[in-house]
Amino acid sequence: MSKINAVRLINVNYNNNAYRISDETLHFNGKSTLISLQNGGGKSVLVQMLTAPFVHPRYRNTKDRLFESYFTTNKPSFILVEWALDQGAGYVLTGLMVRKSQDMEEDRKENLDIIGIVSEYQSPCIQDIHHLPVVEKGKKEMILKNFNSCRQLFETYKKDRDMKFFYYDLTNYAQSRQYFNKLMEYQINYKEWET
């Protein structure tokens, strides 16, 4: 069974935007991991974010926090999880790009714009968890690319036959289904995460 190798969170705000994770990578290296934080340190937030890419929308909420409450602007947030594949077969990056919906239609079901991504690779590359170019690091600050720029980047990667890169608009039922089917190819079964 594949194991979680690393997790990267970019532009995740919580506790009514009082706390912000700008760009953090947690290295699990496929091992069991204990995360010890003080009360209010973000343990529940971390668990909610880690499960979000692997569950359907209604399972992304907890009894205390709606998933959509973390995303209050048009700037994208990223929840990225890298898996080490069995028998040294490489890695697969799974994750979400999320922002508050910019569509003002009243009958819209989703309050978020969500893109699911899946990228398979053998070794470090431009579309891996560490190098995916969704942020630019300046001398003093990190500059986050906008949602549409990232989507165009993903489209370029998807068209490149040398890359095994896929992205899905998870607000579209058919594409959401394709995304979860793609995860199943790597034995990432949403049913195991939703129980």
Question: Where do the model's predicted regions map?
Answer:
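Electropositive, glycine-dotted interaction segments
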Residues: G95-T195
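Extreme N-terminal "head/tail" segments of very large remodeling/mechanoenzyme assemblies
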Residues: M1-K140
